[in-house]
């Protein structure tokens, strides 16, 4: 992951600069982005999460998504999808959809057949609904957008076929 971290930082910073509500405020400095990915790296080493990455064919990572599998003992079947990030230069090329499709078999392989996620953007909500995710509900004024305005957050779930 050491080799990928600079590109992952670029994707995170770019996503925040383009308004993605992913837990960070704009402007996101490189040191904070690097600290985030180092934390993800530790979670990967501790088998608390799974990281997927996608390329557009040029060998450069265009997007990522994570599956949090660090659940409580009574939820060994559940995973939470986090941080679907696609660099702005790669948007509208199917990267997000490809990553979300890839999440499902990977989650199942990890024994996770009930997935949850949340999103603040209508574009992502349309993608999730098109892919069979079910609306759980909306919480108003849940978080701050990168520009510090309040935004609602929509929660989704999906039960996967256990093959």
Each model region followed by its residue ranges:
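Active-site acidic-Proline motif in GNAT/NAT acetyltransferases
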Residues: 87-89, 93
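Residues forming the Rossmann-fold NAD(P)(H) cofactor-binding site
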Residues: 93, 97, 101
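Conserved GNAT acetyl-CoA-binding A-motif
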Residues: 100, 107-120
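Acetyl-CoA-dependent GNAT
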Residues: 2-83, 87, 100-102, 106, ...
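Short aromatic/hydrophobic contact patches that present stacked aromatics
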Residues: 83-85, 114-118, 157
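Conserved catalytic-core motifs of GNAT/GCN5-like acyltransferases
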Residues: 116-118, 125, 129, 134-152
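Short hydrophobic/aromatic beta-strand or adjacent loop that forms the aromatic wall/cage
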Residues: 49, 150-155
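Non-catalytic, surface-exposed connector residues within folded enzymatic/regulatory domains
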Residues: 2, 27, 75-78, 93, ...
């Amino acid at each position: 992951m050491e080799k990928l971290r600079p590109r992952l930082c670029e994707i995170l910073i770019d996503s925040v600069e383009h308004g993605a509500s992913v837990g960070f405020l704009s402007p996101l400095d490189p040191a904070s982005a690097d600290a985030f990915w180092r934390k993800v790296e530790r979670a990967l080493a501790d088998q608390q999460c799974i990281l997927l990455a996608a390329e557009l064919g040029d060998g450069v990572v265009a997007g990522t998504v994570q599956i949090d599998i660090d659940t409580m003992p009574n939820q060994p079947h559940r995973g939470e999808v986090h941080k679907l990030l696609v660099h702005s230069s790669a948007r509208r090329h199917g990267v997000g959809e490809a990553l979300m499709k890839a999440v499902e078999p990977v989650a199942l392989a990890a024994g996770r057949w009930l997935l949850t996620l949340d999103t603040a953007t209508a574009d992502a909500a349309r993608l999730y609904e098109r892919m069979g995710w079910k609306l759980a509900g909306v919480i108003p004024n849940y978080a701050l957008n990168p520009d510090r305005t309040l935004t609602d957050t929509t929660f989704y779930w999906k039960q996967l076929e256990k093959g």
